[in-house]
């Protein structure tokens, strides 16, 4: 997957046809159950492949907590953040041939613990995102963000790593803590894989072999994932959700060895303040400060 290119005009047409700006979360995300095409139980592999059109594919997986209080975040992403992230990725050419996958993350006790789209480079990213079921179950108890790590480690095949030894990127986003493990029964039920218990720390290690892992904590650092991915947790307040595109891009830039000026260039004062603080503690071979 991953053909085509993202165009702002395509997003404008989609927003108009779906009346996204004036619609509620329930009106935007109309699915009331998980579609089999996004159910990891029926997905052997998701691929991010090079092509003549995109010879240097870079997979970026973004997993969003869709339980309980996180409904507002799903709305923000579809209305604003997705378009801004894609526009900036393409206009700045920060990442070669980006291919985005979105994941809806819940808890192993939910009806839909994990849903995953294809890796795409065009408006199909948004179209698939809007087909996900925003289940809204659960509350602020620990969630199972590590299910996405398992899927990326076991069920993705990415040319950037296979051909060039470069890692993809994964950002999980939410306001709850991680569970410490996934039982073998849940692995079997969710992925239809051999039943085996995995510690969350083990899954972080597995996924980090092919992906640069980050967790964006929307609970002001109170639910830190640092014990699983030390130096890769970004603390953001709910009021700063609108800056997610800039924060994600800044983290990718840090991995790419960009300078402080590269990262903050072009941002307005408020964005500079938020981005600088949010990623200043990341351990990626350097950090940025105003």
Segment roles from a protein language model:
Residues 1-290:
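Acidic, low-complexity intrinsically disordered regions
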């Amino acid at each position: 997957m991953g053909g085509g290119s993202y165009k702002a005009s395509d997003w404008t047409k989609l927003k108009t046809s779906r009346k996204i700006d004036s619609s509620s979360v329930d009106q935007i995300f109309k699915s009331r159950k998980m579609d089999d095409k996004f159910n990891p139980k029926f997905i052997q592999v998701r691929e991010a492949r090079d092509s003549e059109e995109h010879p240097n594919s870079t997979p970026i997986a973004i997993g969003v907590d869709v339980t309980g209080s996180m409904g507002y975040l799903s709305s923000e992403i579809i209305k604003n953040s997705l378009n801004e992230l894609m526009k900036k990725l393409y206009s700045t050419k920060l990442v070669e041939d980006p291919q985005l996958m979105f994941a809806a993350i819940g808890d192993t006790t939910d009806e839909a613990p994990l849903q995953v789209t294809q890796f795409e480079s065009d408006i199909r990213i948004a179209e698939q995102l809007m087909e996900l079921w925003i289940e809204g179950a659960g509350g602020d108890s620990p969630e199972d963000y590590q299910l996405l790590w398992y899927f990326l480690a076991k069920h993705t095949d990415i040319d950037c790593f296979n051909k060039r030894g470069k890692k993809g990127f994964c950002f999980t986003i939410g306001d709850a803590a991680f569970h410490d493990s996934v039982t073998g029964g849940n692995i079997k039920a969710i992925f239809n894989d051999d039943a085996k218990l995995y510690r969350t720390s083990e899954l972080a290690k597995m996924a980090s072999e092919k992906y640069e892992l980050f967790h964006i904590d929307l609970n002001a650092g109170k639910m830190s994932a640092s014990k699983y991915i030390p130096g890769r947790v970004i603390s953001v307040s709910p009021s700063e959700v609108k800056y997610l595109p800039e924060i994600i891009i800044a983290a990718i830039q840090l991995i790419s060895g960009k300078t402080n000026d590269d990262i903050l260039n072009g941002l307005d004062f408020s964005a500079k303040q938020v981005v600088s603080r949010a990623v200043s503690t990341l351990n990626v071979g350097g950090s940025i400060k105003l």
